Swiss-Prot record:
Keywords per UniProt: Bacterial flagellum, Cell inner membrane, Cell membrane, Membrane, Transmembrane, Transmembrane helix
The protein's name: Flagellar M-ring protein
Purpose: The M ring may be actively involved in energy transduction.
Taxonomy of the source species: Bacteria, Pseudomonadati, Pseudomonadota, Alphaproteobacteria, Rhodobacterales
UniProt organism field: Cereibacter sphaeroides
Family statement drawn from the similarity comment of this UniProt entry: Belongs to the FliF family.
Ranges annotated as spanning the membrane: 40-60, 463-483
């Protein structure tokens, strides 16, 4: 199947478009050459220049704006803008940040105006909820109001931290009852909105946790959760002893390094000069905690701890005789005889005695118990590095001679000795001290901002630039246009005056009168004569006169017109 022929418009070469474009340009040129458009062109240019000048004035006269209150809620922004607009202050919403911005000169007046109206309101006061509590309120409603007031007060207190723009506190308080043996502990959740560009360190998060837990009875610190607007849990690991210990250890190490560095700088700066030293100190610390308990026993040395002694003695006579009345009667009175020996009865009458003794003694062997707790933070190694600015060396007279050292050996030895004394150098510990000399790169120190950084200087420069732009537009554009419109154009060199080059047709003049005037005039004719002719016959007469004066130019013009028409037809 033969392919369909390509349309002629597609096969038209690119060279065929050139005559069409030339024809369009000629049409535009002819449209611009119309007398009415030419007469209206100055007014159009003046209007365009005026519009551009007004636009530049509006853009350049816009003052520098500053943010009034960062981090305001949307409802607060609407109230703030309404209040400022009513007070005559041009407040707008910044397109980049979305914050309320006011002119720099009106900043303090805007804050005073908003403060007088109680804006921004922020969080309500918790006491207002309790003061509006009506009589006869149920216990559940009163408890809910009390919890809400407590949440608002805690949120207001947390918002006072400079890095926190807004805060919300949620309390989960279980109901207390005497009939419950075990109850759930109270818990709290804190949501923080951090100011852009700011962060909360661990100490600030710990302070918020302590603030909330101390404000609620029975709440433990581990029952408080802190979250920021990015969804990050800030209170994670705040109660972990290992985490707290690591933070304290790092802080202690940084403090020691700073102390040693300050010691070295205070000793070496008077020698090398301010800004000619760079000191860094690194300390390796051992935080291992050891408990050594030692017990010693000496068997040769004893000590009497307690002694107990018990002695029992009995002296009662023993019972004798036959039980009965006769045996219990007293014996008869005996007759005493001189010189008679003692009888057996006398011996039997002597009492019986018994004695027992018991003694107990407790001894303790000599013992020595010693408990040693070494220091928790022990410096294991100290490394100090000192860089001294090398002084410029004079030009060497002998190129073959070795260059002199950047730091003299005597001075280097003195600096090293002072550095070792400052850090408490211990070779057995493995301490290292390094001192070298190198040329420093000159850093550009920012100059202090003077009067040129003041806001009024920028405003004055903006106004001056605006006035200069208006002067350039007025003198370079508007003035030439007005001169061209209001003042007659000067005659060209070799041309006749206006009265001799233009044909003015008065009222009541006939064609013969105009023809007679043209014949009498022997000067050059211009296009203004054709524009001044009113009737068709007058225009033909002027064209004939032009043909008589310059036949070659007229023929060339007609030839170009015919060629353009032929190109358009093709």
């Amino acid at each position: 199947m033969a392919p369909s022929p390509t349309p002629p418009a597609v096969r038209r070469p690119a060279s065929a478009l050139i005559p069409q474009m030339r024809g369009m340009l000629d049409q535009i040129r002819r449209f611009g050459d119309q007398p009415g458009l030419r007469r209206a062109m100055p007014a159009i240019l003046i209007l365009a220049v005026t519009v551009l000048a007004l636009a530049g004035w509006i853009l350049l006269r816009e003052p520098a704006r500053v943010t009034l209150y960062p981090g305001l809620p949307e409802a607060e922004k609407a109230r703030v803008i309404d209040s400022l607009t009513g007070g005559g202050i041009a407040a707008v919403i910044d397109e980049r940040t979305g914050e309320v911005a006011v002119p720099g000169a009106e900043y303090h007046r805007a804050r005073m105006l908003l403060a007088a109206q109680g804006l921004p309101q922020g969080l309500p006061d918790g006491n207002a909820l309790l003061s509006d509590l009506p009589m006869g309120t149920s216990k559940s409603v009163e408890t809910a109001r009390l919890r809400q007031a407590q949440e608002l007060d805690l949120a207001r207190s947390i918002t006072e931290i400079s890095a926190v723009s807004a805060a919300r506190v949620h309390l989960a308080l279980p109901e207390r009852s005497a009939f419950l043996r075990e109850s759930q502990p109270p818990r709290a959740s804190v949501f923080l909105q951090i100011v852009p560009g700011r962060t909360l360190d661990g100490a600030q998060v710990e302070a918020i946790v302590n603030l909330v837990s101390s404000s609620v009875p029975g709440m433990a610190r581990q029952d408080v959760t802190v979250v920021d607007q990015m969804g990050r849990l800030l209170s994670r690991g705040s109660d972990d002893p290992a985490v707290l210990l690591n933070d304290r250890q790092l802080q202690h190490r940084v403090q020691l390094e700073t102390l040693y560095r300050n010691r070295i700088e205070s000793l070496l700066t008077p020698i090398a000069g301010p800004g000619n030293l760079a000191v860094q100190v690194t300390i390796d610390m051992d935080f291992t905690r050891q408990e050594i308990r030692e017990e010693q026993v000496d068997p040769d040395r004893t000590a009497l701890l307690a002694e107990q002694s018990q002695i029992e003695e009995t002296a009662d006579p023993q019972a004798r005789g036959i039980p009965g009345a006769v045996s219990n009667s007293p014996p008869p009175e005996a007759a005493l005889e001189a010189g008679a020996p003692p009888t057996a009865a006398g011996e039997a009458a002597a009492p019986m005695r018994s004695r027992s003794q018991n003694s107990t003694r407790n001894f303790e062997v000599s013992r020595k118990v010693e408990t040693t707790l070494p220091a928790t933070a022990r410096i294991a190694r100290v490394s100090a590095a000192v860089v001294v600015r090398a002084q410029p060396q004079p030009a060497a007279t002998d190129p073959a001679a070795p260059p002199p050292p950047l730091l003299p050996e005597a001075l280097k030895a003195d600096l090293e000795r002072l550095t070792r004394s400052a850090v408490g150098f211990d070779a057995d510990r493995g301490d290292v001290v390094t001192i070298t000399a190198q040329p420093f790169l000159d850093t550009v120190v920012p100059e202090a901002s003077g009067w040129s950084a003041e806001p009024w200087v920028a405003d004055l420069a903006r106004q001056g630039f605006l006035l200069a732009a208006l002067a350039v537009v007025a003198l370079g554009v508007v003035r030439p246009i007005l001169n061209r419109v209001l003042l007659p154009a000067p005659a060209a060199a070799g041309a006749l005056p206006l009265g001799e080059t233009a044909v003015e047709v008065g009222e009541g003049e006939s064609l013969d009168d105009v023809r007679a005037r043209l014949k009498a005039r022997q000067g050059a004719l211009t296009k203004n004569m054709l524009d001044a002719a009113r009737s068709h016959e007058e225009q033909i007469l002027v064209i004939r006169k032009l043909v008589e004066e310059d036949e070659g130019r007229i023929a060339t013009t007609i030839r170009q017109m015919i060629a353009a028409e032929l190109d358009t037809v093709k």
